[in-house]
Amino acid sequence: MLFQTYGDKKNPAVLFFHAMGVTGVSSEPVAKYLQDRYFCILPTSTVYCKGQKYVSKADEIRQVENYLHGQNVNCLAMVVASSIGADLAMAFLTQTKLPIGHIFFVGGQFAQIGKGTRRMMTPFLYLAIKSLYWSKGGTLKKILWCDDDSIKPYFIAAGENLTYTNLRRQISDSLEDNPFPSLPEELQRHIYFEFGSIEDHFKYRQAVKEADPSGHYPVFEGYDHMQYQIRDPKGFAEMLAYIAEHDGMPKLLFIRK
């Protein structure tokens, strides 16, 4: 893995888990608005690191834990996970011994997919991600609701370093067809599972609610997948800071009543 940080180590730490097909620096626009108050840690999965070999989800978590220990991070103010980053983040949450203040899932990819289906998906995912590199971001609109120039570099960098073997290994132990983990109730009360009302991932919301009924489930009315994070990183960062500091969602006009 590769790690980038923003802010002073003396400040409360915020750990980001990134979406599929992008590097960890994709959270940079948000981190820049938090760095005055927080120590932001942006790992890039081994899958998108040149010359590195993806071993397993457990190994990814081990690398994150080792990095946090090396940075003398003994607690996390917040964990933020976008899209498929939710899969790795959930595994991290069930294993880490670090105290965590709040967790925010952005359009979490909580699919439970059979092994055979995941195996068949791999070549299509590989071509989709590599095409973003080959076309310099030109194919982004075919796989995402937007093709903003501001986010293309993260896809291009990820596609450049991606190998088929690493992606196959990642998909083999991600989005597994297992019961969704139920986290401790005390932790659930500090978790936010956000979905846009028009995004495809909205379909996972009910299953997550059944597993973690004490969590918070804000719906961003009229928003697509990760739209608030992409289009308004400052507003998104301010929302995260509000949650961390006030233990509740700010009053945003687009949150479904």
Residue ranges with predicted function:
Residues Y223-G235:
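Catalytic histidine-centered segment of alpha/beta-hydrolase-like enzymes
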Residues G116, L132-E185:
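Conserved alpha/beta-hydrolase catalytic His-Asp/Glu region
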Residues D212-M226:
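Catalytic histidine neighborhood in serine/cysteine hydrolases
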Residues I41-M78:
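Active-site loop/oxyanion-hole signature of alpha/beta-hydrolase fold enzymes
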Residues V80-A89:
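Gly/Ala-rich beta-loop-alpha elbow adjacent to hydrolase catalytic centers
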Residues T94-Q95, I100-S131:
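Flexible "cap/lid" loop of the alpha/beta hydrolase fold
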Residues S172-E210:
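Conserved serine/cysteine hydrolase catalytic core
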Residues T5-K50:
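Conserved HGGG/HGGXW glycine-rich cap/lid loop of the alpha/beta-hydrolase fold
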